[in-house]
Each structure stands twice: as C-alpha cells, then as structure tokens.
UniProtKB/Swiss-Prot annotation:
Protein family membership: Belongs to the aconitase/IPM isomerase family. LeuC type 1 subfamily.
Organism for this UniProt entry: Salmonella paratyphi A (strain AKU_12601)
Molecular function (Gene Ontology), one example: 3-isopropylmalate dehydratase activity
Name recorded for this polypeptide: 3-isopropylmalate dehydratase large subunit
HAMAP family in UniProt: LeuC_type1 (MF_01026)
Length: 466
C-alpha cells in the first residue's frame, strides 16, 4: 500500500498498538529547555525514576536568557530560578546541557539541527510548539506539554494518535528577494491560521526543493501557525550535505548507510492526502502581516484590508478587532506604516543565511532615526560564524544592536520586549496580541524586509531597495 512520508515515519516508530487505543510511539530525540522542564524533572524525582535515555536527551537555555549579558540574574527572579533548576536537573539526571557559558548554547530549534542532533527519519519532541522546525529534515517533530515531557523523560515513548495528512505544493520558482518566510506566510494567508488543524503537512514542489535547509526550517517552523501538528519536507541531497560532518551525525560508513535509508523517506507514488493545497511561487510577493494572527497577511504593496470586504462574519469581526488593536486604518498602504522597533532573530529566522540577508540590506545604510533594531543570532555557532564573516560590524555600523543568542523579543519572557503601542517589524513566528510585550504590535516579515524597515523607518518593498 502506498504511504505518505508522515505515515512511514509514524508506522516506523509504533512500539505498541491495540484496538481502540492510542498508539505508543518511540521517541528518538528529546530536546529540553528551562521553561517547560522543571515540573517534569520534579515528577521523576517524586517517583524515584531516572531519565531512561539521557544520551537521547539534550538541553539548552533559550527562552528567558538575557541577550545583553551571560549573567543568569539579568532577566529577573523567575528566569534565574528556571535556569538554575535546569542546571541542577541536568546534573542530577545526567542530561547534556548547553548552558549560558557553553559555545553551543542557543535557541533549541537552532541548536538541534546545527549539532546533528536532528536527523532524517527520527521522532523528535520538545516542550515547545515550534518543534515542527525539525520536520525540515524529514523527521516527525512536534511540541508537547510538560506532563508529556515527564513521560518521555521516564519512558522514551509517547502516546500519539494518527493525524490527517495535508500536501502543500509550491510550484515554479520564486522571484529574487522572495524567501521561505514569504512563502510560508503566503501559504498561511491562503489556508488561514486554522487551515491545517488536525493535519501533518508535507511541503513539496519545485520551489520547496530549491530552498536551503535554513529555508526549509523556516517553512516547517511555521506549520504550527496554520494549526498543523507538524510540518515535513522529504530529505534529499540538500539535507544530506547539511547533516554530514555535524557533531552527532553518523560518520564514515555509518553515514553512507544512513543516507541509503534516508533516501526511502519520501511519499510513495499513488499515496493519497486528506487535503491538498497548491500555490504558484512566481505569484508570491514579499509578505507582511497586518493583524493579530499569521493568517492576516498581505503583500507589502497592498493596502490594509477593510473588514467590510470579508464575507465571513467571524473573519470580519476578527479583522475589526485586529485593526483596532494594531492601530491601523483600512485603505492605508502598508508602505505608509511607520515602525518603532525591529527584531531580527527567533527560531524562525536567526540562522546564518537569515543574518546574511539582513546584513546585505543594512550594509552602507543607517537605522532610521527613532527606530531601535535588534539582531539576535540563534546560537553561539551562528554568532561566531557571523562575526567571522564581519556581519556584526555591518550591523553595528548601521546602528543595529548585535546581541547574544536567545529567544529574545519573540516572546515577552526576558528583557527584550515591546512597550504598549510600539510597532515592530519582526522575523519571528507569532503576531498575537501581547506576544512581544503587553500592548505591543507585531508585524511578521522576512529578515531582509525587517532590515529594510529598520533603515527606512517604515515597511518597504525589498525589491525596490538597491
């Protein structure tokens, strides 16, 4: 019987299945951070249980770390407690930890792939909704809650029901300046923020194959923003070349054997999907969100939509509420909207390719008066590589702030946040009310578009910036 990639990955990891019961899956990799793990470790301690597979468990600090200093006290008391608990728990249970002073420390979904912890064919979980990022490698990766974190720590397994399948095909070639971020925002604009609910999405088509691994990670990172359980891209030579030689990747003959298996990780001819969505890459322009969910998105050359133009009463009410929160008026060109802050970073867009794209725009220009612009590399290795390439100097000379690795302004859990009413061009993944700080207004864009907003002081079409 012909199977989709998702079905192959799921079936290969079923440990036990009985009639009328949720299947039990084996988990190959468990990624841990300071926010969703303390209670899970406390649960192990209370029941006198060890971590079953410490060698398959990797921890880092990211959500509430300061990006201005490596001082554990810098982000407040709660952050300090969570980070100290992670240090204590990893020491006690034998889990490898990339702490604030470790050269590999960084955002969990940046660290995993760059250290070769993430490999094709694996099941990967983390107490974080954007675990879908790792699906870029052809791995079944999804976020879990704290009680499930404890279950995986104790058993290396997890009960999971089968999801529906969705194929999103992006045909043709994207125009110059159009990035994976624009592609995925255009997809969510078409499906809506709940269009993938109950599904695992496989992204395919010529435009997807043309993406680098960084681009594919951006794509899968935001699968959750259309309501999907996970996102997938079938592995290919781009994947294998990225993985080869990384710290935890197979070496020598083991790598060659692994590649032979990884080549089988693709949807069979004749396999059927529950839902199919198609987009033409050449029709995708630079995208900017205008509302308070990622599905409320338009091209940078468009005008702010009028809620009256929505036929669906729920969408109309949502648009009215979003415009009121965002302080925007219908009919205004997006390029007339001024910004206060710019954030280039997050598990969506903080990799070396993202920083290069932003630096290309920043080079020889200056951040607009009154704008604060942050560049936050996703990990220690990304920061080191960017500095070796001189990107930090480009940003600093242009007036951007060059920070230490962390989740930063993606979410208001550290010192990097918006003040009420401030408007931000952000390369992160969520533009919900208050996501970047109480009363803050978030517009999601690509790294190049964020840099363009920083130097012009308003949203600008990257295609018109020479």
């Amino acid at each position: 019987m012909a199977k989709t990639l998702y079905e192959k990955l799921f079936d290969a990891h079923v440990v036990f299945e009985a009639p009328n019961e949720t299947p039990l899956l084996y988990i190959d990799r468990h990624l841990v951070h300071e926010v969703t793990s303390p209670q899970a470790f406390d649960g192990l301690r209370a029941h006198h249980r060890p971590v079953r597979q410490p060698g398959k468990t990797f921890a880092t600090m990211d959500h509430n770390v300061s990006t201005q200093t490596k001082d554990i006290n810098a982000s407040g008391e709660m952050a300090r407690i969570q980070m100290q608990e992670l240090i204590k728990n990893c020491n006690e249970f034998g889990v490898e930890l990339y702490d604030l002073n470790h050269p590999y420390q960084g955002i969990v979904h940046v660290m995993g792939p760059e250290q070769g912890v993430t490999l094709p064919g694996m099941t990967i979980v983390c107490g974080d909704s954007h675990t879908a990022t790792h699906g870029a490698f052809g791995a079944l990766a999804f976020g879990i809650g704290t009680s499930e974190v404890e279950h995986v720590l104790a058993t290396q397994t997890l009960k999971q029901g089968r999801a529906k399948t969705m194929k999103i095909e992006v045909t043709g070639s994207a125009a110059p300046g159009i990035t994976a971020k624009d592609i995925v925002l255009a997809i969510i604009g078409k499906t809506g923020s709940a269009g993938g609910t109950g599904h695992v999405v496989e992204f395919c088509g010529d435009a997807i194959r043309a993406l680098s691994m960084e681009g594919r990670m951006t794509l899968c990172n935001m699968a959750i923003e259309m309501g999907a359980k996970a996102g997938l891209v079938a592995p290919d030579e781009t994947t294998f070349n990225y993985v080869k030689g990384r710290l935890h990747a197979p070496k020598g003959c083991d790598f060659d054997e692994a590649v032979e298996y990884w080549k089988t990780l693709k949807t069979d001819d004749g396999a059927t999907f529950d839902t199919v969505v198609t987009l033409r890459a050449e029709e995708i322009a630079p995208q900017v969100t205008w509302g308070t969910n990622p599905g409320q998105v338009i091209s940078v050359t468009d005008i702010i939509p009028d809620p009256a133009s929505f036929s669906d009463p729920v969408e109309r009410a949502s648009a009215e509420k979003a415009l009121a929160y965002m302080g925007l008026q219908p009919g205004v060109p997006l390029t007339d909207v001024a910004i206060d802050k710019v954030f280039i970073g997050s598990c969506t867009n903080s990799r070396i390719e993202d920083l290069r794209a932003a630096a290309e725009v920043a080079k020889g220009r200056k951040v607009a008066p009154g704008v604060q612009a942050l560049v936050v590399p996703g990990s220690g290795p990304v920061k080191a590589q960017a500095e070796a390439e001189g990107l930090d100097k480009i940003f600093i000379e242009a007036g951007f702030e060059w920070r230490l690795p962390g989740c930063s302004m993606c979410l208001a859990m550290n010192n990097d946040r918006l003040n009420p009413g401030e408007r931000c061009a952000s390369t992160s993944n969520r533009n919900f009310e208050g996501r970047q700080g109480r009363g803050g207004r978030t517009h999601l864009v690509s790294p190049a578009m964020a840099a363009a907003a920083a130097v012009t002081g308003h949203f600008a079409d990257i295609r018109s910036i020479k």
